[in-house]
Amino acid sequence: MAIIYLILLFTAVRGDQICIGYHANNSTETVDTILERNVTVTHAKDILEKTHNGKLCKLNGIPPLELGDCSIAGWLLGNPECDRLLSVPEWSYIMEKENPRNGLCYPGNFNDYEELKHLLSSVKHFEKVKILPKDRWTQHTTTGGSQACAVSGNPSFFRNMVWLTEKESNYPVAKGSYNNTSGEQMLIIWGVHHPIDEKEQRTLYQNVGTYVSVGTSTLNKRSTPEIATRPKVNGLGSRMEFSWTLLDMWDTITFESTGNLIAPEYGFKISKRGSSGIMKTEGTLENCETKCQTPLGAINTTLPFHNVHPLTIGECPKYVKSEKLVLATGLRNVPQIES
């Protein structure tokens, strides 16, 4: 049928030339291409969104997790100033200030911290699970605290952790394990205390030359405390070093220590995964909803590209750095007379 149609078409045409294409018009609209500037076209349509509403909104009806003056570390460890975050509902994304003041109240560091933040970009809810109850450590003192983490003027400590110290001038080997039967991966955090001198070491743990050993089917980590003189931070010359791991389903994590162990009381079951992220912002949640959020504000558009901010969460156009992006159609506007 197609062959017959073409034959009929050609037999119906009179003249010595057939032109198939757009009809040139008198448009003066020009665009810049990768190879050439000021190319004249018949039509150009803007396909780049440049605006936002300046607000932090719920994403598809789900509010973000507002950390306020707390950092990621302060939230997960349980800084006493972050008590409102001890139990949090599902979040769409996380709002963290550039320099939150409530992080590690007891000075130190958090190993692989950026990797932990990257993990949070695919998590939308944690369920706290008590894995090593405080009262299981019957041969050790579990009320260790510091004025650096004070509550109402009294020494305190990270709510989700247990600082094990000597009991009745004795520190026997501390052993504890947890088998993950939760049905999901679990985030486990622990710490090692690094005293300022040997006197502090003996006062807290009786023993010297101590170790902290942590093991799973994929992890074998043994740490020894580093006793050293350091500048004081929050009034302390000693430090705490925190580490984390993901415990797979049905795997077991085991702790063994002769001193300096900061044991986890709680683990964090990853109860819901999904696209999330951490928005670095000084803003607060407003009464609005969106499908696409950036740290600068929400985007509401049907255009395929935007240049608002490289970090987006939700159903968003593709980010480009360009200041202008258009879709050009039609032939170059150069009218020509054909005989």
UniProtKB/Swiss-Prot annotation:
Q: What are this entry's molecular-function GO terms? A: host cell surface receptor binding
Glycan attachment positions: 25-26, 38, 179-180, 300
Gene Ontology CC, one term: membrane
Residues exposed to the Extracellular side: 16-339
Q: Which residues pair up as cystines?
A: 57-288, 70-82, 105-149, 292-316
Q: Which Pfam families match?
A: Hemagglutinin (PF00509)
User: What else does the entry mention about this protein?
Assistant: Major glycoprotein, comprises over 80% of the envelope proteins present in virus particle.
Family recorded in the similarity comment: Belongs to the influenza viruses hemagglutinin family.
Q: What is this protein called?
A: Hemagglutinin
**The organism of origin for this protein:** Influenza A virus (strain A/Ann Arbor/6/1960 H2N2)
